[in-house]
């Protein structure tokens, strides 16, 4: 499958002054017509649609009256159990192809755990730290771009110096990463390994092995391996999941990876189960702090999810429903981008096989203008630059499209409007 749509050999940039002027007049007229429709459409976040949330309606009645015992006899109604119940941990271990001992099950948000492990490293240091990160003169963090804005918000909150590296089709630019980690101030990096937000790119095993084996100057260096879209295919095929913790152990770096995933875009976005996969030493460090923060996760909800899925194949069955719901929306976005923009050579976009986003690169210098025009037309887009640390896209060209929430009919109107805004911003750029 194509990863990036091919740009036209003819570009708006090649139009002479008269032709670009006429084109600008025409597209401005279309934009004014768009504004007159008083639209109110939202493409900002990768939220599941109501149809997708309905797939998990059965959860609202689970585990059911009298069903409160986990497989090991744990009464899920009571306190305790920092690791989570084995029922749901085993399902996720089977789904990801890892030992169940590697998996901790938590509450709804894996992002909460990411914040915890970074904040605890900052306050206390992690189990490989010489001192807390807050005592370091500078903490630097590697950020593959374009990437996930909420990741960058966490490292921004702690004042880390964020260093951008390209997110390529096979994963982060490893030549750049391997050079950066020679600096002991570089303490970690973000990675979304499967159907990455927003490009849809997937880390290859070769890149994963390089991440596992590379020498780092900081002994407490950590990779936050956020496998948010591990099973979120748009086709009938599921991606191969890399046992990244196992790779780290095999390479002699068992504590390098903090790996995460969750059911947030599988069942109910605000009421699911998160999973933390890491080494035995890291788990001991984590539960040592987590046991002070709280007494344990929502085990009733974990049991409900275990009953709902049944086994790993049950998870895949649910994901096939999601794929059937999402694929027509992604296809509609790609169809409109191709029909409206391809002939003018003003944009390039990813063609993902899974995940929740399409990454759109417009004429450099115009992304913020496209977002501004879209807002004027009643179409909300994620802010230009949001896929970069500190919201600063050096080329001002990237926009993230989130097709999941609106019905196809609304999505078609919104994307036709976005295409008009891309063309108008490009025409303004080349006319000046």
Curated annotation (Swiss-Prot):
Against InterPro entries, the record matches this protein to:
AspAT_Ic (IPR024551), PyrdxlP-dep_Trfase (IPR015424), PyrdxlP-dep_Trfase_major (IPR015421), PyrdxlP-dep_Trfase_small (IPR015422)
UniProt GO MF annotations: L-aspartate:2-oxoglutarate aminotransferase activity
Q: Does the keyword Transcription regulation apply?
A: no
Q: Which residues are noted in the entry as substrate-binding?
A: 45-46, 148-150, 400
What result is annotated for mutating residue 197 to A?
A: Loss of activity
Result of altering residue 400 to A: Loss of activity
For this protein, the record's Gene3D superfamilies field holds: Aspartate Aminotransferase, domain 1, Type I PLP-dependent aspartate aminotransferase-like (Major domain)
Task: Give the EC class as a word.
Answer: transferase
> Which keywords, in A-to-Z order, does the entry hold?
Aminotransferase, Pyridoxal phosphate, Transferase
Give the cofactors, semicolon-separated.
pyridoxal 5'-phosphate
One Pfam family linked to the record:
Asp_aminotransf
Q: Which reaction does it catalyse?
A: L-aspartate + 2-oxoglutarate = oxaloacetate + L-glutamate
Q: What is the effect of changing residue 47 to A?
A: 40% decrease in activity
Outcome when changing residue 265 to A: Loss of activity
* Transcription regulation is among the record's keywords: no
Q: What is the effect of changing residue 109 to A?
A: 30% decrease in activity
Share what the entry says about its subunit structure, partners included: Homodimer.
Q: Tell me the protein family, please.
A: Belongs to the class-I pyridoxal-phosphate-dependent aminotransferase family.
- This one is known as Aspartate aminotransferase
């Amino acid at each position: 499958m194509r990863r990036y749509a091919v740009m036209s050999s003819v570009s708006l940039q090649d139009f002479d002054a008269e032709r670009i002027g006429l084109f600008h007049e025409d597209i401005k007229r279309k934009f004014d017509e768009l504004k007159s429709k008083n639209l109110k459409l939202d493409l900002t976040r990768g939220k599941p649609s109501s149809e997708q949330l309905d797939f998990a309606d059965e959860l609202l009645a689970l585990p059911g009256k009298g069903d409160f015992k986990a497989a090991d006899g744990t009464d899920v109604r009571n306190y305790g159990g920092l690791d989570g119940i084995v029922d749901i941990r085993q399902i996720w271990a089977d789904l990801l192809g890892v030992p169940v001992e590697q998996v901790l099950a938590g509450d709804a948000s894996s992002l909460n755990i990411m914040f915890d492990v970074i904040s605890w490293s900052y306050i206390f240091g992690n189990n490989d730290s010489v001192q807390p990160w807050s005592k370091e003169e500078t903490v630097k963090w590697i950020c593959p771009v374009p990437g996930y804005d909420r990741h960058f918000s966490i490292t921004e909150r702690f004042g880390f110096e964020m260093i951008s590296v390209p997110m390529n089709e096979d994963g982060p630019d490893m030549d750049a990463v391997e050079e950066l980690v020679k600096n002991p101030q570089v303490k970690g990096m973000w990675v979304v390994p499967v159907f990455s937000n927003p490009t849809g790119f997937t880390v290859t095993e070769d890149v994963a092995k390089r991440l596992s084996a590379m020498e780092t100057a900081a002994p407490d260096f950590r990779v936050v391996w956020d496998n948010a879209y591990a099973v979120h295919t748009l086709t009938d095929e599921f991606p191969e999941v890399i046992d990244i913790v196992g790779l780290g152990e095999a390479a002699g770096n068992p504590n390098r990876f903090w790996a995460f995933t969750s059911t947030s875009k599988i069942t109910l976005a605000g009421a699911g189960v998160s999973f933390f996969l890491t080494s035995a030493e890291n788990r001991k460090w984590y539960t040592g702090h987590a046991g002070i923060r709280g007494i344990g996760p929502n085990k009733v909800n974990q049991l409900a999810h275990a009953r709902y899925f049944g086994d790993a194949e049950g998870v895949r069955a649910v994901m096939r429903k999601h794929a059937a719901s999402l694929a027509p929306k992604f296809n509609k976005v790609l169809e409109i981008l191709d029909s409206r923009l391809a002939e003018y050579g003003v944009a390039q976009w990813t063609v993902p096989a899974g995940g929740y986003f399409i990454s759109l690169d417009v004429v450099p210098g115009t992304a913020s203008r496209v977002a501004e025009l879209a807002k004027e037309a009643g179409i909300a887009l994620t802010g230009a630059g949001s896929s970069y640390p500190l919201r600063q896209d050096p080329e001002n060209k990237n926009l993230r499209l989130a097709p999941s929430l609106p019905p196809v009919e609304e999505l078609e109107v919104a994307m036709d409007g976005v295409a008009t805004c891309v063309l108008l911003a490009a025409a303004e750029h080349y006319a000046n």
